[in-house]
Amino acid sequence: MRRTASRTAGALLASALLVPLMAGCGGEAGAGDDGTVTVTVGYQSRTINTVTAGTLLRSLGYFEDELRARGERDGVTYEVKWQDYATGAPITAQMTAGKIDIGSMGDFPLLINAARGKQLNRPTKLVSVTGYNLRGGLNTVVTAPDSPLGSLKDLQGKKVSTSVGSAADGTLVRALQQAGLDPEKDIRKLNQQPAVGASALQAGSADALSQFVAWPGLLAFQGRAKALYDGAELNLPTFHGVTVVEDFAKDRPAVLEDFLRAQGRATEYLHEHPVAASESVAKATGLPAEVVHLYNGAQGIATFDTTVKPALVAALKKDVPVLRSAKLVGDVDVDAFVDEQYVKRVHGSAYAKARAAGPPAARGGEVWLKGEDSTSAFATSAEVLRYAAGHKDRLRAAYVPDAGTGTLWFADRAVWVSDGPELRPYVTGSAARADVAAHPGARIVPYATALDLARPS
C-alpha cells in the first residue's frame, strides 16, 4: 500500500508533538527553587557517531567538569540532565516543547529540527558537528543473510523498513532514484524505529532495512544481515550535529560554549584512545565494542570533528529538496540555521585551520586481537588478511576498507574478489560483481579462501 506523503508528514509531526514529556525535565536552563541551573541534553546513545555530544561525553563527565568550574567562578550550581532517545524526532519534539536545551541528531532530522523550531516559534541553531562521512557511508541498506536480493533494483515491489525523515531514509530515497525506482510508488516503505525494523527483517516481514549507524554494522556482525547498498556509493556527505534552542544560546552562551568545549575534549579523547572509547561506548550502550570500533575507531567510517565544514553545509542544502518533496518540511534557510559563532570562540584562532582539514588519509585496515588495548594498522587489505590468518585464535575483529568507496567493513563479512595477486574487499555483493565484470579472470571468493590466498607462499 502506498502511503501519501502528506499523510506521512502529518503522522510524523503528530507523533513528534505527542511524545510523552519526561518527569523532572529541565529545559531552557531554568533555575530551580534552590538556585540550581539545570541544562537538559538530548542524545541518541546507540547512534554512535554522536558519542562526542552524548554517550562518550556523558561517561567522561567533561560537561559536568566544565560547569563545575564555571559554578565556582560565578557562584551558581549547575546540573546536567541527560535524555536518551532512539532517533532525532523525539529530541526535536522535546526541544520545541521547551524540555531540552541541547540535542544531537543526523542531517535530515536536523533540517526537520530547524523547520519545526521555526514553525512552533522556538527556533534552533546548528552549532557543531559530531561525526561525518564525506561519501555517505554512515547509512546502509541491508537484507537478510540468505536473501536473493542482489541490488537496489531488486527492491521493486518489496517491503523496506526505514525511519521516515531520518538520514537513512534520505539515503534510501536517493539510492532508489539513482537505480531508476520511484521511492513512493515502487516499494512499500515501512516507517519503523530501527529496532522494530531489525526485528521485521529477521522475521521476514520486511525484505530490506535502510538504517543509520550502528544498526547495519551490528546486524552484519551478528550474522543477521548482509549489506545490499553502501551509502557511500552516493558520494554525498552525511553527518550528525549538535542543535540548540536559540533562546538558550542567547541567554546562556557561556554554558553552550562549555558544552562545545567539553565536546571538543571528548573528540580528542576518542582520537587519542580509540579502543578505550569504543569499549566505553559499548559498555554504556550494550553494543559490541567491535561494532562501535567499526564506525568510531582510528580508521572508522565516521570522522569526528566539531567544526562545521562548508562541504557539510552544502550537503545539508541539497537535502532540503528531498525532504520538501516528501512534504516533511517546507523551505529551510540553512544559512540562517547554521551558527558557528560559539564553536569558533571555543576553537579561537585555530578554527579556520581545523575547519579546512579533511578526514585522515585512507589506510588498508586494522586488526584487533583479544586482550589488546590497541589495534594494528596495515597498508593493504591483503596484509590485514595475512595477519588475521596468523592470529586466528586471538582474533577479535579485522576491518578492511571497501576497494571502491573506502567504507570500512568487517573482513569476514566483506565480499572478496581475487584478481591474480590482488585481493579486493567490498561491502556489497553488487560492487564485487561489478568488479569481476570489469576485470576478466577476476572471481568472487569466500572469506576462508581469501585468507588462504593471502598467506605467504
Feature-to-residue mapping (PLM):
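Pocket-lining segment of extracytoplasmic ligand-binding domains
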Residues: 189, 195-283, 382, 390-398, ...
